[in-house]
């Protein structure tokens, strides 16, 4: 029978000093036999997705204590990728994921916590905490801050739904007036919460539902809606039950590695492909699987991508659809429900809240339940009032969206496309693979060939695009922006947004060993592995080389002979795999430490002490 980890610091004469310190935090004699639950919060005033979390940790703590546990809260860092975008701040985004995972490990192991509730939300925070939960393998429940309401603005007599990406694209479009840009800017991000489309943050919070580590509605219930409070309240009670099940009943189904098994990772990736999630999720899912010692690789993702259809398109793939619309259509449980009907899910995986995922779907899918409570829950609507306050409104849609032929969520028989929303491409340009969000690619450019325009930094590409030096038909190649080469694997949202603002969104391709924001759409291919800094072929591309992209056949090729590539490789080996241009980039000791152990994206950009 497992023993509560916390007994290490709460029992025995030799722990008198530790108990004295625990007492100084407010613990009493009656608390020393209870499970100590870490409330892992990520409140910060820097990030709209986290600005409302300050009091939510204590909300969970009170519920833990009411359920018979002891709650101890601490905070992690949280980087806002949108604010860090387009300058050296983005170098810190992906490395912050490892720092978050490490900090959770440090705090939980140093203080011998028995279990934890992870209050996450934005891009690297959910992945970092997910990695920590699988690394530590103690009972864990995830509850995120929730998505932002979509912006609404009336311009020239027409109402538009907006998000962050709209503001960025408008700012670079010379045809849009300063007044209209300002109007869009002021309306794009109206409330607290993670950005309103199917960007990285919301994608990851949705995937925790499929993994079985969070409650139904975690990925889609708006941050501002009163219904979201229930998730925090239930998480507090649930984690105490999970802790008791494991430590007092030896029930390993309460542990993250049992719940988030390989089959559960297949479910999560199936969902990701079906909903056209951010390509960053591939990076984070691979990293989380690595932490859980689960054999889940790019090959598994490739296999799934070939049989899972695209059942939902949300901004940026469909600019007028946001997370509030997904929720109205039944949220993640209803997407999983459609996948289940198509025989594409592992139903028997356990979850933190139900015996199996199949049981959860049967209860929470709006097309198969008669529960008015469930149906009311998914009618939660935006309040339409700018606010930074959680649970501040309780608006409801009059009706649910249950149209599975033409609605926000489609059935397997009526998909947006038979091919899923993500694809793995391989070829001599990316021997270990690269990723494209096919849900955001226009059908006219699923096959594309063009001459390479080579840039050795994101900044150089942006300068060329804005100067109209990139033309229709070009393939923009941005290299030395991978985990090691960047370092930090910057997001390329500005280059893709500027291509769109220049009218080239359907006329150019972009390939990089960096990554893309969840807000990216177009023929944007990232995670090219190996990256240039690790000797990848992307480092051998020269200006004007022809590149062939074939998404239906999952290939990406540099039209250069093997003999020529071998000669170029020998030349590059002699020079060293570094950018030829001097980049004005402040790479600090902290970033150098990350780069020293970073692997390429096909391994999730995790650290490997054997990397040289």
Swiss-Prot record:
One of its GO terms (biological process) is L-valine biosynthetic process. The keyword DNA damage does not apply. The modification N6-carboxylysine is found at residue 124. Disruption phenotype: Does not nodulate the roots of pea plants. Its EC number is 4.2.1.9. GO terms for cellular component: cytosol. The active site is at residue 517. Binds 1 [2Fe-2S] cluster per subunit. This cluster acts as a Lewis acid cofactor. One of its GO terms (molecular function) is 2 iron, 2 sulfur cluster binding. Keywords: 2Fe-2S, Amino-acid biosynthesis, Branched-chain amino acid biosynthesis, Iron, Iron-sulfur, Lyase, Magnesium, Metal-binding. Pathway: Amino-acid biosynthesis; L-isoleucine biosynthesis; L-isoleucine from 2-oxobutanoate: step 3/4; Amino-acid biosynthesis; L-valine biosynthesis; L-valine from pyruvate: step 3/4. The keyword Metal-binding applies. Mg(2+) binds at residues 81, 123-124, 491. It catalyses: (2R)-2,3-dihydroxy-3-methylbutanoate = 3-methyl-2-oxobutanoate + H2O; (2R,3R)-2,3-dihydroxy-3-methylpentanoate = (S)-3-methyl-2-oxopentanoate + H2O. It is an enzyme of class 4 (lyase). It holds the Pfam family ILVD_EDD_N. Homodimer. HAMAP family: IlvD. Belongs to the IlvD/Edd family. Functions in the biosynthesis of branched-chain amino acids. Catalyzes the dehydration of (2R,3R)-2,3-dihydroxy-3-methylpentanoate (2,3-dihydroxy-3-methylvalerate) into 2-oxo-3-methylpentanoate (2-oxo-3-methylvalerate) and of (2R)-2,3-dihydroxy-3-methylbutanoate (2,3-dihydroxyisovalerate) into 2-oxo-3-methylbutanoate (2-oxoisovalerate), the penultimate precursor to L-isoleucine and L-valine, respectively. This is Dihydroxy-acid dehydratase.
